Every structure is written in C-alpha cells, then in structure tokens.
Regions:
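Intrinsically disordered, flexible peripheral segments
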Residues: 1-322
Length: 322
C-alpha cells in the first residue's frame, strides 16, 4: 500500500516521528565497521556530486545534479531514506514529510526566518552553531564535511565532530521562492512542456532545469539551499535534516508536473550519446560508491525508467497548490 507524504507543518505526529527517526538513524549501524546509516546518505550525496559525467568534462554535470537525472536520482535517495526511517521507527506506514517552502516564500524576508518550520518543536532555527530545536548543539552532531586535502584543490570528505550550522536568509536573494514562481516553473512552455533538452546541463531548456534552479529567475531548489545556508551549502548538505524536507517538496512538485501534463516522457533516452552516462532513461543510478561499498543502502540496480511512476510507493497529501 502506498504511504502518504504530508506537509510537516500540518501534522505534529509526522513531524515528531521524523525528528525521532533521523536521530535514530544517527545511532543505527548496518555493520559495525560502517558509518551510521544517516551519515552514509551524506557520503552518497557527496560522491554523486564529485563524479563528473562524463569524467573531466566542462559541462559541470555530475552523477546526480546539473543534468536530467537530478530528479530521479533524488527520488530514489528519498525512497531509500524513507525505507530506513520506516525500519527504525517500526512503522511501515510512515511517509517522509515535506516542507512547502514556497508557502513561506509569501512572507516577508524577516518573517521567513521566523516561520513555523524553524520553531523549537520543529527544525529549530539559525546559528553557527544552531542553538535551538531538536538539532541544536549537544543534540545533533555533524561527523563528516566537505573539505580539502592539503596541497589539492579537489574537495574531499573530512571527519569532524561539531554542531550543525545554518545561516537563514543570509544568501542572495535573501528570500525563498514563492508559489507563483513555482507555478510558473511547472507551467513553463505549456501545453508543449518538455522534461529536459540538449545540452543536458545547466543551460538546458525544460522543467528539470527550472526546478533544479540554474536559469536566471527564482532558482527554486538551488535557492532553498542557499537561503538555509550553513551545512545546506556544500555537497554534504544532507548533514542538515531540512535537506530531506526540501527535496521531498521538490519531488512533490515533479509529481504534480507529471500529473498535470500526463507524464511527459523522460529524456534523454537510451540511444543518446555515451557522454550522457548516468543520465539516460535506462542508465543505472549512481550507487553509494562506484564499487557499491554500501550496497545495502543502494538496494539494487535502479534506473530512471523505474522511478517515473511512484503511485504504488507513495502519494502526496496535496498537489492543488501547483
């Protein structure tokens, strides 16, 4: 039976379960010689961003971002994260909640930083370190972050032991996307909408790039990362539990677009250039590492084509705002 993913601000039970679940994953070890389950997802996301597609290209495209696979790759990440939350919560009906940041985008910049999502009983507030809410200093620890090896300009993972960092509203522009901006992204090009197009990167026309947030304008998903700031900025952004609420809303917007326009086809298809490996319809999604070291997280050989119809897995409580 499909679970229902709900707005975290409309259901205190789901909110409390989510907070409990992510804390349980921080102390959950699938094997004694592995990092905790929560941090494995951080590692997976980091390596996806460090894997250029194709290698050494100038496109900026990587194995999970800046190209067509952005939406299905993160959809699969959310499904797996949701599965592990269900496991540690012992609740197979638990649905990953979302944060409708476009609703907060209707507030003034000052009000956005004081919105309900940042309350003490929800995600807590801003600060370096965060000093309020369930993920404040002493209650949540960042164990790995993006850093640099001495003498090298290539980012790497660095072991740390520190509190969570946020800098709400400190980026530019200092406000979240609005409902109108999201609706405009959903309906751009209607009725002849397209998912993506050449050159299949940050310069592409199509829904994926509008939602990911590379064209000039509202910048949608990207702007949320910048607006939250702190640990939401680098490739280790899943260190902040707000990451999953943000991406669940991104997935909700994609789901709404699929329904409104009757499942426009995913492109590029399987016959596209080998330089688009990892982004084509039937390419295997990037695993936790290239050698699948953490394969129990990855759970099999999954492709974008497997993730275009999610109706048997989950639904959203509403899409009417899109």
């Amino acid at each position: 039976m499909a679970v229902v993913r709900r707005n975290i601000l409309n259901n205190s039970s789901v909110r409390d379960q989510y907070i409990e679940g992510v804390k349980l994953l921080k102390n959950d070890f699938l094997r004694p010689d592995w990092p905790n389950t929560y941090d494995i997802f951080v590692i997976w996301h980091f390596h996806s961003m460090m894997t250029q597609t194709p290698p050494n290209s100038g496109s900026g495209r990587n194995a999970a971002h800046r190209g067509p696979v952005f939406l299905p790759w993160h959809r699969w990440m959310l499904i797996l994260f949701e599965n592990h939350l269900q496991r540690v919560l012992n609740d197979s009906n638990f649905g990953l909640p979302y944060w409708n940041w476009a609703a907060d985008g209707e507030l003034t910049p000052f009000q956005q930083k004081k919105a309900a999502i940042w309350a003490n009983n929800c995600m807590g507030g801003s600060g370096e370190p965060v000093t309020s809410g369930p993920f404040r200093a002493g209650q949540w620890q960042v164990n790995i972050e993006q850093g640099f090896t001495p003498g090298s300009m290539d980012p790497t993972l660095v072991s740390v032991r520190r509190p969570l960092r946020r800098a709400l509203g400190s980026g530019f522009p200092p406000k979240l996307p609005t409902r109108t901006e999201v609706r405009n992204a959903v309906r751009k090009g209607a009725p002849n909408v397209i998912y993506d197009s050449p050159p299949w990167d940050v310069n592409s026309a199509g829904f994926r790039n509008e939602l990911e947030g590379w064209p000039d304008g509202p910048r949608n998903h990207n702007r949320v990362h910048v607006w939250v700031g702190g640990d939401m900025g680098p490739a280790t952004s899943p260190n902040d539990p707000i990451f999953y609420l943000n991406h669940c809303n991104v997935d909700r917007i994609w789901s709404g677009w699929q329904q409104i326009f009757h499942n426009p086809k995913y492109v590029p298809n399987s016959s596209a250039s080998p330089s688009l490996r990892r982004h084509r319809l039937n390419d295997l999604l990037f695993p936790v590492t290239e050698s699948a070291v953490f394969d129990p997280i990855y759970q099999g050989r999954v492709r974008p084509s497997n993730l275009l119809d999610i109706s048997s897995r989950y639904t959203y409580d509403t899409l009417t705002d899109l």
